[in-house]
Amino acid sequence: MRQAPNVFRLGSDSEALGGFAQVKKKEKVLDLGCGGGVLGLYLLAREPSIQITGLDLNPDAVELARENFAANELNATVVQGDMRNARELFPAGHFDLVISNPPYFAAGSGYSGGSARMEEECTLDDVCAAAGWAVKNGGRFAIVHRPERLVDLFCALRQYDMEPKRMRFVQARDLPPSAVLVEAYKQGKPGLVVYPPEVRE
């Protein structure tokens, strides 16, 4: 898979999310902030029958994602656009599954990592609002984020009618979790299952 210096690069969090998200045959899947298309590639490797749509604001990322899908002879749609305009870009409830590895750090947090890691172009609320619009009732939204933002994440999910149902922490051995994987259901009933952590050596 080709990567580019001005496009958010492949990381272990994307790998973890690609393995955590539940994907079923012939589902329509939306990747919010798709970057170079890595999550779509993971999911297509697991279930080739799905229909992947990637969305990214960065035109270089969109071009790279299209190249990566084509290089692997995979059929996917990649859209250049702002997820804050999801209502204009996609019909309501069009997707069975929405996935995202969004910016982690709130503006003003003191972290300096560019828009791919900082909430400069979109906030956690923006991501959840877009997912809540695009996913169908009973559909799923899978996201990876930072453990210290978990309360913010749960609040945003419920604000947009998505109920957290599955969760797994990701950590190095003998260290605190560095990431958390969450899958929420649109209009789901309360009841969260917490899985054993994924431990990285």
What are these regions (language model features)?
Residues 2, 6, 123-177:
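Conserved Class I SAM-dependent methyltransferase catalytic core
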Residues 27-33:
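Conserved class I S-adenosyl-L-methionine
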Residues 36-49:
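Conserved SAM-binding loop of SAM-dependent methyltransferases across substrates and taxa
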Residues 51-56:
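Conserved SAM-binding motif I beta-strand of class I
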Residues 65-66:
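Conserved SAM-binding loop
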Residues 73-83:
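Conserved SAM-binding strand-loop segment of SAM-dependent methyltransferases
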Residues 89-97:
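A short acidic, Gly/Pro-enriched loop at the edge of an enzyme's catalytic core
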Residues 102-130, 138:
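Mobile active-site "lid"/loop adjacent to the S-adenosyl-L-methionine
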